[in-house]
Amino acid sequence: MPEIFRFYGFSFFFYSREHEPLHIHVEGNDGMAKFDLVEDEFVLKIVHNIKSNDLKKIKEVIDCNKDIIIKHWIKYFGKED
């Protein structure tokens, strides 16, 4: 499970045997979320047990680090989508 980074007590990562589309998982504080890259923007697809204020921070971190996430995906999986 390649972890890309940690912020606010949350881990941002991919699973080793991922599938398309390009996406990122977030886990921490007994919650989880998944964001898919849709038309050049990460969109929330799944969320469980994450407070709305934490979700807002997570989305900001993802938006500010979008290029890093995409580069890590391409490096690990070999393609963008």
Model-derived features: positions:
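Negatively charged, low-complexity tracts enriched in Asp/Glu with abundant Ser/Thr
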Residues: M1-F12
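Generic preference for hydrophobic/aromatic residues in regular secondary structure cores
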Residues: I4, V43-I46, N65
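Aromatic side chains
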Residues: F10-Y15, F35, W73-F77
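A short, structured beta-strand/loop element
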Residues: Y15-S52
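C-terminal structural segments of small proteins and small subunits
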Residues: N53-D81
